[in-house]
Swiss-Prot record:
Domain of life of the source: Viruses
Source organism (scientific name): Grapevine chrome mosaic virus
Similarity comment: family membership: Belongs to the nepoviruses RNA2 polyprotein family.
Miscellaneous remark of the record: Virions are comprised of 60 copies of the coat protein.
Gene Ontology, cellular component aspect: host cell cytoplasm; host cell nucleus; host cell plasmodesma; viral capsid
Pfam families in the cross-refs: Nepo_coat, Nepo_coat_C, Nepo_coat_N
The protein, known as: RNA2 polyprotein
GO molecular function: structural molecule activity
Length: 1324
């Protein structure tokens, strides 16, 4: 039987349990390698089956206990005791043979006197036994009690396991360690002269030292830092014992008195010998406890203990070393066979621990041989029952395998298994002592070892706890059991895994196994009080419904999380939350509370609502079971502790009797959180219960006090209420995003959300003893074990009572301005309807938000635009709203704008047949790259263009006038440059996930059933009919790649009249396809305004960004466009690319070193031209112009990126290269070309930087440069600031040269801000 067959059999299941219970099976396999190396070829086929037979027949099915370990050590590992050290002094400590294990405790019977309390006056409580003194008894009696007396400690090691060295050797070692102490150099402030001599003149001083080597001898030079400290001491202090050995101007006189003269300290030799004399003198004077080093103990030999190794360990290691066996003529090595055996064992252990964590049952053993007879229990909720191996399968064939390798292997294996804990308790002492020596040398004192420190803390804790509970009160608050949840209710308890932990079988996996978890019960909010809010939503005949109030549920503190993260825990999973409620209202007052645990990081109430409960506050005390089921990363929690705290928020609204005043204390809460910590994201063995039926039985009933009702909870019990109220319908709002989240009592706060969704919560009348179904849940009629943990109920499901609705965006913002737009009756494609200067409109409106922005100095919120143009499904018109942040649209555009140019600016499309497209938001940090400032326009010129994107298929009967409204909405944005949506060099694939590409609008004739295809050439330039050239922001990013592969996210929007309809199917393919192929390949049947995704399919697995090679969009009408008889208009649609999830191997960059050509100056062959060249380069990438030369400005990925973004800044290297004129003679080449940088006005040259000279024959030069200004980034083009950097190129022999070329090598970290397009002009 091989391993594959064996693992699949029932015998393998039992054998796996036995192998793991015994432990150390991997060591057993490694020892059997020795035997199998010498085995005959006939035995190899029986190796696998006999190993398992040995496990099944010989290995004992009980773990090794401490008593057996001590008995084995005393019986087989004992050796001669260490004699007293009288004559021969021990130079090092030694391991004691007792192993540091205390002896067995001896049971001893002792007698103690027990006093009998006297009976109270007037009563006789003495019945049987000893009577008290009041009733004539002795008042006490003797009682025998058996106690365990500890065995005496070992006389040689005092129970530590290590016999210390002799006292005299320890004293010598202490003195030797004192001599080896390393003292740091003095840190005196250095005089500028000393600093100069120790740095700039150091090489001269070393050469001077070699000159006087015949006087100083062959000595080692010291470091400059050491010499400078010695020179500073000599300069400021009097050193009477130093004598200069080098004859100089002053002979052999002493250098002292500290007068600051250079001749006294300049002549100090730069050697360790003479600098140590000065530094040791300084230490003797200023360092307490300093002793001058002596060479008396330099030859002291430090002996070490070495590793802990016993005789049995040596015998096993040395007895079975044999060369690998390999039969003649065969290439199979038996070691490879055993390696595969070990690897299969590791796979088996992974599977076994997964099964063991879910096993809840009993293992029965036979009384005759203590072997496993049967297994009965549940595995993952499924009942299992396994009989004895003899009853399941036949016994494997018998082979005398035991005689092959003898009894010695098994005998020694048992002893080594017993010895292993002792060896682990005594690690290699060499490394430990080296660390102690190192720390003592650095600290200069004794170190408290970790075991002794822990022992001291334990003794202190016992002392404190003994005093604390010595006179404790006997009174105790007894709570109802159903009001408390324990670990046993939520997590698995008393399972097979807990038994393994108790027997220390899996103890070694406690830190290394990624599948283990840590279960904690954390007390969060303890003294929190929920108050009645100010605002009331509605009043009914039965009561008043209040507004929501939010309470942050405190999580574990920063120190606790930091401690858990340091020991290796990565994730914290909040499984359950037990919310204890103490009502502050009179008993049976008809007031109810709807408590919802919400996730504080979502603006959608439906997604944020984790669980809700309906609580009756007429009872004094209640508990609510909540199920957050929320997992968080501890690392991010440590980085943003505030975000971690607000992850769980309690939302409460009240309904009941009227008359409650705002600020009234309603109830107090104490939240207990059941958390499970995981070391990795691997999955692991969770301890959550698969079924909570047992908990429901314990916490439900007529006489119970727990009240649970709501959604996402296990069940609901309604009892003890005198009257059933009808809780009214209301809109549950998400947690507002203002920082920090506090109680909303006392002031109504407006949610600062760009877009939020509320959740409609309806009456609870029909939900007695059942969950409240909501839209995102499925049928909860089955058992809880069949569904997600804790999200199902055993109650019958009924009709849903929750629906969702969009919040009104117009009521949530602050008015900024409004603009009136006229729409002609017969609007044409590209017609400019309006041009709105946003700054001017905001200032002219003089709204309240404008005043706030004037006070703040900048626009601190994004603008949400609402087009009030009434929807019309039959006109077939689409309006483009183009936000031109940097004034890229040319000034000559007045009445019409070509769509090829307009779509490069990523317009927002308002389709009149779709009312959802009438609202959109402009993100200033994303599009502008900065926040708009009211103190001036700066770089940005925010303008909103309104353009008709299509011709009206059905004209209006009259001109339409509508309003465009702007609201300030959302979170407050940071002042200054953007902190997100920044593109940084080198361009990465992450930047492609958020690009907006508006493909050209396309038309399909009525009745046309043919497919339309066009290539995915996203990086090519767009050229209009008038000759204007345009590149989009996406083209700038994609220009850095020759091609891309991955998944494209897009959507299709139909702009034609509702009279014209069709059904389209879209696919990505690289060749012509048929209808049958289209139906079988990946495709999307597109609906209007629905985001779809397709993977790029082409013969090259990628598509080219330039040209038409690669994949193509194939649009096939599954139903050809159709319209009424009198309607002859075409179907108009457009495709918008939202982003690309690129596949890294499929994306090829165009330039690995990020070097791009900027421009070239070509001198015309005209002798009348000036011979002087003066060219000034600004600190911004732009088109260069020079009157006396022909300039070629190159187009490349870097130039397109600078033109299609708002601003850029960063460091680079400018590479200059030039060519000589053919008519120039070498004898005339006597000039140079100068390159120098500066700042400020370049005509004045007030501030100069670097200066480089290049000869005509050198032909190239590289100069570092940085693009930017005092404001940080700069725009492409425009008028340079006076305070910008510049680089000037000058030569008086321009006639020698033919051309001058400049390349830009972009360095990592170069940044781009904002999104735009360019150049939008007609080439000259």
């Amino acid at each position: 039987m091989g391993f594959s067959e064996f693992f699949a059999s029932a015998l393998g299941t039992v054998a796996r349990a036995k192998a793991t219970l015994q432990g150390g099976f991997a060591r057993f396999l490694s020892e059997t390698v020795v035997t199998l190396q010498a085995a005959s070829p006939e035995m190899r086929k029986f190796a696998y089956s006999k190993l398992w037979e040995e496990v099944d027949s010989v290995k004992e099915l009980k773990p090794l206990t401490a008593q057996e370990l001590v008995a084995t050590l005393r019986k087989e590992l004992w050796c001669a005791q260490v004699r007293a050290q009288k004559c021969t002094l021990a130079s090092t400590s030694r391991f004691c043979t007792c192993g540091g294990i205390p002896g067995e405790a001896t049971p001893t019977v002792i007698k103690e006197t027990v006093h009998v309390d006297e009976c109270p006056n007037g009563r006789n409580l003495c019945r049987h036994g000893t009577r008290c003194l009041r009733h004539g008894g002795p008042g006490s009696f003797q009682q025998e009690r058996e106690v365990q007396v500890d065995a005496p400690k070992c006389p040689h090691c005092a129970g530590t396991g290590i016999v210390p060295a002799s006292a005299s050797w320890r004293e010598i070692r202490r003195c030797w360690r004192e001599q080896r102490k390393v003292h740091s150099l003095p840190s005196l402030p250095l005089h500028p002269d000393v600093l100069f001599e120790g740095t700039n003149a150091w090489q001269t001083r070393l050469r001077w030292l070699k000159t006087w080597r015949h006087v100083l001898g062959d000595v080692k030079p010291c470091t400059p830092e050491k010499w400078m400290q010695a020179a500073q001491i000599m300069r400021t202090c009097a050193v009477p014992s130093f004598e200069n050995p080098i004859p100089g101007q002053f002979g052999y006189e002493r250098l002292y008195n500290g007068e600051g003269k250079e001749e006294y300290w300049l002549q100090i030799p730069a050697t360790d010998k003479y600098t140590d004399l000065i530094i040791n003198w300084w230490h003797a004077k200023n360092t307490p406890g300093w002793e001058e080093p002596s060479s008396s103990l330099m030859d002291f030999k430090r002996n070490r203990m070495g590793p802990c190794l016993h005789i049995v360990e040596k015998r096993v290691r040395n007895s079975y070393v044999a060369p690998p066996w390999k039969p003649w003529g065969e290439d199979i090595d038996i070691l490879s066979v055993m390696d595969s055996l070990s690897s299969q064992l590791e796979d088996f252990l992974d599977v076994f621990y997964d099964c063991a964590a879910q096993f809840d049952g009993e293992l029965e053993f036979s009384l005759s041989n203590d072997r496993l007879s049967s297994v009965t229990g549940e595995l993952g909720g499924v009942p299992i029952s396994i009989g004895a191996p003899s009853k399941i399968s036949n016994t494997p064939p018998k082979v005398n395998f035991a005689e092959l390798y003898g009894n010695l292997v098994r005998h020694n294996h048992r002893k080594i298994s017993a010895l292993r804990p002792i060896l682990m308790a005594h690690p290699d002492q060499d490394e430990i002592e080296d660390q102690l020596d190192h720390l003592e040398n650095k600290q200069g004192g004794e170190i408290v070892s970790t075991p002794s420190f822990i022992k001291m803390l334990k003794e202190k804790r016992k002392e404190v706890r003994g005093k604390e509970f010595e006179e404790g009160s006997e009174g105790r608050l007894v709570r109802s059991k159903d009001l408390e949840l324990s670990k046993k209710d939520i997590f698995l308890a008393h399972t097979l895994m807990d038994k393994f932990h108790g027997m220390s079988i899996v103890k070694k996996f406690g830190k290394s196994d990624p599948k283990l978890t840590k279960v904690c019960v954390d007390l969060t909010n303890q003294e929190e009080v929920i108050k009645y809010p100010v605002k009331e939503l509605q009043t009914t005949s039965e009561g008043v419904l209040s507004a929501q109030t939010f309470t942050v549920l405190n999580r574990p503190q920063f120190k606790e999380l930091n401690r858990l993260a340091e020991v290796g825990w990565k994730e914290a999973k909040s499984v359950c939350l037990n919310l204890h409620i103490r009502s502050y209202l009179p008993v049976h007052l008809p007031v109810y509370a709807f408590c919802v645990i919400m996730w504080g990081h979502s603006s959608n109430a439906e997604q944020a609502s984790l669980s809700g409960a309906y609580v009756y506050l007429g009872d004094q005390e209640a508990s609510v079971l909540q199920l957050p089921l929320l997992c968080g990363y501890i690392g991010n929690a440590l980085e943003d502790m505030e975000a971690y705290k607000r992850s769980l928020v309690l939302s409460t609204c009240f309904f009941g009797t009227s008359g409650l005043s705002p600020g009234q204390n309603m109830f107090g809460i104490t939240a207990v959180e059941f958390t499970e910590y995981l070391p990795t994201s691997y999955g692991g063995i969770t301890h959550e219960r698969d079924s909570w039926n047992q908990m429901l039985r314990n916490h439900q009933g007529v006489d119970k006090q727990r009240f649970i009702s709501g959604f996402n909870v296990v069940d609901f019990v309604e009892a003890g209420k005198e009257k059933q109220l009808h809780f009214p319908d209301f809109d549950l709002q998400p947690v507002p995003k203002h920082q920090p989240i506090v109680r909303t009592f006392g002031k109504e706060k407006q949610p600062l959300l760009n877009k939020s969704r509320s959740m409609r919560v309806k009456t609870f009348t029909s939900f007695r003893a059942g969950n409240i179904p909501i839209g995102r849940q499925i049928d909860n009629t089955a058992e809880a074990i069949n569904f997600e943990l804790g999200r199902a109920s055993t109650s019958n499901a009924i009709n849903p009572r929750l629906d969702t609705s969009e919040t009104n965006l117009r009521a949530g913002g602050e008015f900024a301005f409004i603009h009136t737009i006229d729409l002609p009756t017969a609007v044409t494609e590209g017609q400019v309807l309006a041009k709105i200067d946003i700054f001017k409109k905001i200032q002219d409106a003089k709204s309240m938000v404008c005043v706030q922005w004037m006070q703040a100095g900048y626009v601190n919120k994004n603008l949400t635009f609402i087009s009030h143009l009434a929807p019309s499904q039959f006109c077939g018109v689409a309006i483009w709203y183009i936000f031109d942040a940097y004034g890229k649209i040319p000034s000559d555009v007045t009445t019409s704008l070509e769509l090829e140019i307009a779509r490069s600016l990523c317009p927002h499309v308002h389709v009149l047949r779709d009312s959802k497209t009438s609202v959109w938001t402009i993100d200033f940090h994303k599009i502008c790259g900065q926040s708009l400032n009211f103190s001036g326009r700066g770089f940005s010129k925010p303008t909103l263009w309104v353009i008709a994107a299509s011709t009206a298929q059905l004209p209006w009967s009259a001109q339409v006038t509508y309003r465009l409204e702007a609201l300030a909405q959302g979170d407050e944005i940071a002042h200054g440059l953007a902190t997100r949506s920044i593109v940084t060099y080198p361009i990465s694939l992450e930047h492609l996930k958020d690009i907006e590409i508006m493909l050209p609008p396309r038309q399909m004739a009525i009745g046309n059933a043919g497919s339309i295809n066009f290539p995915l050439s996203f990086a090519v330039q767009q050229k209009s009919s008038s000759g204007r050239i345009a590149y989009s922001y996406a083209a700038g990013l994609l220009s850095h790649f020759l091609g891309i592969g991955g998944t494209i996210h897009f959507k299709i929007q139909c702009t034609s009249s509702a009279f014209v309809t069709a059904r389209l199917r879209v696919a990505l393919w690289g060749d012509t396809i048929t209808l049958e192929q289209l139906s079988q390949m990946p495709h999307v049947d597109c609906d209007v305004d629905v985001v779809s995704s397709l993977k790029i399919q082409s013969p090259f697995y990628a598509t080219a960004n330039f040209g038409d090679s690669g994949a193509r969009f194939w649009v096939t009408p599954m139903s050809s466009p159709m319209a009424p008889e009198t309607m002859e208009s075409k179907l108009e649609y457009y495709i918008q690319i939202l982003g690309i999830d690129a596949d890294p191997p499929m994306c090829r960059q165009i330039n690995y070193d990020q070097r791009f050509a900027w421009f070239t100056l070509l001198r015309p062959p005209d002798p009348k031209l000036s011979k002087i060249l003066k060219l000034t380069l600004p600190s911004r990438v732009c088109n260069i112009a020079y009157k006396e030369a022909t300039v070629t400005n190159y187009v490349n990925a870097f130039a397109i990126m600078c033109a299609t973004t708002g601003m850029h800044a960063g460091k680079c290297i400018l590479h200059f290269s030039w060519t000589l004129n053919k008519g120039t003679s070498f004898k005339d080449l006597q000039g140079h070309i100068s390159f120098y940088s500066g700042m400020g006005d370049s005509t004045i040259g007030e501030h100069h930087g670097e200066f480089h000279l290049g000869g005509p024959l050198s032909s190239s030069l590289a100069v570092p440069f940085e693009f930017g200004s005092f404001a940080g980034p700069v725009t492409s083009g425009g008028t340079p600031f006076t305070s910008e950097n510049w680089l000037r190129v000058e030569t008086a022999h321009w006639d020698w040269l033919t051309s001058l070329t400049v390349d830009i090598q972009v360095l990592p970290g170069f940044r781009f801000y904002g999104r735009s397009a360019g150049p939008l002009t007609i080439p000259s």
